[in-house]
Regions:
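Helix-loop boundary and gating motifs at the non-cytosolic
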Residues: 1-70, 76-80, 86-94
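Hydrophobic core of transmembrane alpha-helices in multi-pass small-molecule transporters
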Residues: 21, 82, 89-96, 102-124
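Membrane-interface elements of multi-pass transporters and channels
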Residues: 29, 72-73, 99-103, 135, ...
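Intracellular juxtamembrane helix-capping segments at the cytosolic ends
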Residues: 121-136
Length: 144
């Protein structure tokens, strides 16, 4: 009778898939039509919305920061912290229309949360992927 070898990463893979799905859902909520709806709800002009959405294309510049942060140091702690802050910044965008603040303060908070979220996303994404990939043996990658 053959016994199955215990898979130590089964739970981690399930949690990774759940985290990736949540991250994807949040990323959808801060782009396209959803972003346009939020900006119109807080009274931002279309011109300012266009400028902010083009900021995403500058993300490669912030990925360079990750090289210096991840250089020869453990990434688990700071990647987890920055990734949580990144997702929190994106999620907080949706509470701005619900808060009773001045028009200018709502726009300021929106810009601060959006830019912070995108900057942190670009800083943390590459080291996070490298860390997650290092948890899986080379010959087992790609199979769930």
């Amino acid at each position: 009778m053959e016994t199955k070898k215990q898979d130590g990463y089964a739970r981690s893979r399930c949690l990774y898939v759940a985290e990736a799905a949540l991250e994807y859902f949040i990323s959808l909520l801060v782009t396209g039509a959803y972003l346009a709806k939020i900006t119109s709800a807080i009274g931002m002009s279309d011109m300012l919305t266009g400028i902010l959405t083009s900021f995403v294309s500058l993300g490669f510049g912030f990925q360079i920061i990750a090289v210096f942060l991840a250089n020869k140091r453990p990434v688990k702690r700071w990647v987890t912290l920055l990734h949580c802050l990144n997702q929190m910044a994106f999620a907080l965008i949706y509470f701005i229309p619900l808060v009773h603040l001045s028009h200018e303060m709502k726009i300021f908070l929106f810009i601060a949360f959006l830019l912070t979220g995108h900057i942190l996303n670009n800083v943390v994404n590459s080291p996070k992927i490298n860390w997650f990939m290092s948890l899986v043996e080379d010959k087992r990658r790609g199979s769930f």
